[in-house]
């Protein structure tokens, strides 16, 4: 069996090595010729899997995408070809949720305010949006949800987008990209909607770059410095508008979901599905893949303040590091930029490929004196806290 896998997908050798010959490739430059003799194809969101890519292959049995979304996969075509397909919904939801929560803590610290006093509107209440909500609700922050696709079948309370924008002073975006239809998300936040944001609103985009009109965002930010922005995703990736970067408080290269746990979970979910397709018993465990955290545990002597919670979060992931690297790579240091016309696209893809794979809150064990008032840290995701 020949397995072709994206070179940036972790633990492929550990999980699939016993099943056949593995060839790793650059997902952006994959061609029909390169996959013509593949039995299994493992990709990420940077690879379009369609009739064109598979035109020379007559033996493919399984396509796996270590992603939440499937907009890069022609699933109808795979069904016609009777090629099994699986993605990994929710694999990085915890990572995205914690990323957004940490970004909000960083904004609160930078601008001398309290996250706990904010009203956070979450646009898109699927896996990642719900993960953000869990973090915020564990900390005691008021959360508003907007998701017209699931509100009729979901018992949670939802509000309209207009109401959310009116009431919220933090907005976090977690929707798939949809270019047409009643609930189109392409340029969901256009210039008009951006201008309608409350004074001092924080806007975070951790889903798809084109959900926010980036050119319009520049125009609005030039007039409204009160709006604070966190962008992990960019219109036109992997070539973001460099002129937008100075207007963004925290800028990262589409790595919100890049926790070690999340990336391992995505690959592992594909391993589980392929074993089902092959009719084989699973022989690998995901937790066995993960290294030990750098410290066994930290001891809390009292309930942490918001500043202490930020410091605790920085033990697991310091967002400032990725922000500084992003700016240095795309704006400042020519030595960090890839050659013109290279597949690394001036460093954006290179940053993703070389990301240090942060850990999730669960990797850090907290010891306490047993006080029940820190139980909320367990709900936030840390291990070993509370009663």
Curated annotation (Swiss-Prot):
* Main location class: cytoplasm
Active site at 208, 237, 254
- Give binding positions for NAD(+): 147, 232, 257
A GO biological process of this protein is: pyridoxine biosynthetic process
Q: Where in the cell is it found?
A: Cytoplasm
Which CDD domains did the record assign? ErythrP_dh
| Catalytic activity field | 4-phospho-D-erythronate + NAD(+) = (R)-3-hydroxy-2-oxo-4-phosphooxybutanoate + NADH + H(+)
Q: Which InterPro entries match?
A: D-iso_2-hydroxyacid_DH_PdxB, D-isomer_2_OHA_DH_cat_dom, D-isomer_DH_CS, D-isomer_DH_NAD-bd, Erythronate-4-P_DHase, Erythronate-4-P_DHase_dimer, NAD(P)-bd_dom_sf, PdxB_dimer_sf
**Cross-referenced PROSITE patterns:** D_2_HYDROXYACID_DH_3 (PS00671)
**This protein's record includes keyword NAD:** yes
**What EC number(s) is this enzyme filed under?**
1.1.1.290
| UniProt-annotated binding residues for substrate | 45, 67, 258
Which keywords does the record carry? Cytoplasm, NAD, Oxidoreductase, Pyridoxine biosynthesis
Instruction: Please give the Gene Ontology molecular function terms for this protein.
Output: 4-phosphoerythronate dehydrogenase activity; NAD binding; protein dimerization activity
By sequence similarity, the record places it as follows:
Belongs to the D-isomer specific 2-hydroxyacid dehydrogenase family. PdxB subfamily.
Q: How does this chain assemble?
A: Homodimer.
Q: What does this protein do?
A: Catalyzes the oxidation of erythronate-4-phosphate to 3-hydroxy-2-oxo-4-phosphonooxybutanoate.
Name of the featured protein? Erythronate-4-phosphate dehydrogenase
**Top-level taxonomy:** Bacteria, Pseudomonadati, Pseudomonadota, Gammaproteobacteria, Alteromonadales
């Amino acid at each position: 069996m020949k397995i072709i896998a994206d070179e940036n997908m972790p633990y492929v050798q550990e999980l699939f090595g016993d099943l056949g010959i593995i060839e790793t490739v650059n997902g952006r430059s994959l061609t029909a010729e390169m996959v013509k003799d593949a039995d299994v194809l493992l990709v990420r969101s940077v690879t379009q899997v369609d009739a064109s890519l598979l035109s020379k292959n007559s033996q493919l049995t399984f396509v796996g995408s270590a992603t939440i979304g499937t907009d890069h996969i022609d699933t109808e075509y795979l069904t016609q070809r009777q090629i099994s397909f699986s993605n990994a919904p929710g694999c990085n939801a915890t990572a995205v949720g914690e990323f957004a929560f940490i970004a909000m803590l960083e904004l609160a610290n930078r601008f001398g305010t309290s996250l706990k006093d904010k009203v956070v509107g979450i646009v898109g209440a699927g896996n990642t949006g719900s993960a953000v909500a869990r973090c915020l609700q564990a900390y005691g922050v008021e959360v508003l949800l907007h998701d017209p696709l699931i509100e009729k079948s979901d018992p949670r309370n939802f509000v309209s987008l207009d109401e959310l924008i009116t009431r919220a002073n933090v907005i976090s975006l977690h929707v798939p990209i949809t270019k047409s239809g009643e609930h189109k998300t392409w340029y969901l936040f256009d210039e008009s909607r951006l201008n309608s944001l409350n004074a001092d609103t924080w806007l975070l985009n951790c889903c798809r770059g084109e959900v926010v009109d980036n050119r319009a965002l520049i125009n609005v930010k030039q007039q409204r410095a009160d709006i604070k922005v966190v962008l992990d995703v960019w219109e036109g990736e992997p070539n973001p508008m460099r002129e937008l970067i100075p207007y963004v408080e925290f800028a990262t290269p589409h790595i919100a979901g890049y926790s070690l746990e999340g990336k391992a979970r995505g690959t592992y979910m594909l391993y589980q599905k392929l074993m089902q397709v092959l009719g084989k018993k699973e022989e690998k465990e995901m937790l066995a893949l993960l290294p030990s955290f750098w410290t066994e545990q930290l001891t809390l002597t009292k309930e942490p303040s918001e500043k202490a919670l930020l410091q605790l979060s920085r033990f697991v992931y310091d967002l400032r590091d990725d922000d500084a690297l992003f700016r240095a790579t795309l704006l400042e240091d020519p030595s960090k930029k890839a050659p013109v016309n290279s597949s690394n696209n001036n460093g954006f893809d290179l940053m993703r490929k070389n990301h240090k794979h942060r850990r999730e809150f669960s990797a850090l064990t907290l010891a306490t004196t047993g006080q029940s008032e820190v139980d909320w840290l367990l709900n936030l995701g840390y291990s070993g806290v509370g009663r």
